[in-house]
Amino acid sequence: MFRDHKGMMELMEEGRPERPLSFWKIIFEVMREALPFVLVTSSIQIISLIDQETFQRFVPIFTTYSFEEGKELITLFGFNANKIIMIVISLAMSISTAALPLLAAHYSVNDREEVKRVIANNLGLFAYIMIPASVGMAIVSEPIYNVFYSPDPTGTYLLIVSCIMCVFLGLFVTFTYILQSMEQHIIAIKALGFTVIIKLLWQPMMMYFLGGAGPLIASSVAFFVATLYMCRHVLRLTRFDLNYVLKKFGQVILASFAMAVTSAITLFAIKQIMPIGGKVRALIAVALVGLVGVATYGLITLKNRLADEMLGARIGGIRRKLRMK
């Protein structure tokens, strides 16, 4: 920075605004842009707080569980499973934030065609990575739970449901970032408000019918409805190619289904050979099943060239090495 100090000063002189901005005006602008980001990115924590504050109060009213059983359930899905799925959720956040500068730059100069392209590609990339990651984690939920905690069928079941919720949560996060990169902060905050309201309304009913999995399903419904609201607004604002996005989601879901089948068969075979209750054996099972799953998904998406569309033309080199057309 010291070496380039002169050049930076010249750039600052050239970029000086025609009218001076006061210190408080700058602070206000920073707060106006930053606060919505902080609020919306806290959605995961807000939903977790709702579960922590309401679940045990609702347990004796809407379920047949005792107070102690309620405490155990909230530990299983609110803490144990939540820590594991954060690995997958971080993928959604990294995908969403990667396109922010590019999308904001094109939107600021009113380049509508590039805005539509970036949004469609970002959603396609989200599906390409997030859906198989969530499906894969659901398949290996038993051994991966055993790696971190003591074997528990209920904990494994709640982890599977949490993995399903990850997809809806990831979509919610992706659309909030898309909206905020286009300065649609109010819409993103409204979507968060809808999420909280729907979560509170659905929580008792889902707990009554589904017990411990109820809060997770309520969260999934809330995130899904809020995502539809945001998607409608983004579609109206940019007219991005929704058919293209849905087509990519369909291709990813089919490839993920094939991956799930091969992974489940592999896990079944491993369980016939050795028990996976111990942490080391569970870790070996996760690694082997993960390897089979990644290979299956990778080969399918290379074959139908979905990988090329999502990850770039350089992926074609892998296909040539594998002698795939």
What positions do the PLM features span?
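Transmembrane helical elements of multi-pass membrane transporters/channels
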Residues: 1, 17-98, 259
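Membrane-interface helix-loop junctions in multi-pass transport and translocation proteins
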Residues: 1, 196-228, 239-243, 267-287, ...
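Membrane-interface junctions at transmembrane-helix termini in multi-pass inner-membrane proteins
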Residues: 164-194, 209
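Alpha-helical transmembrane segments
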Residues: 175-183, 231-248, 275-276
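Alpha-helical transmembrane segments of multi-pass membrane transporters
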Residues: 187-212, 222-233, 257-267, 292-301
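Membrane-proximal transmembrane or re-entrant/amphipathic helices at the cytosolic face
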Residues: 265-325
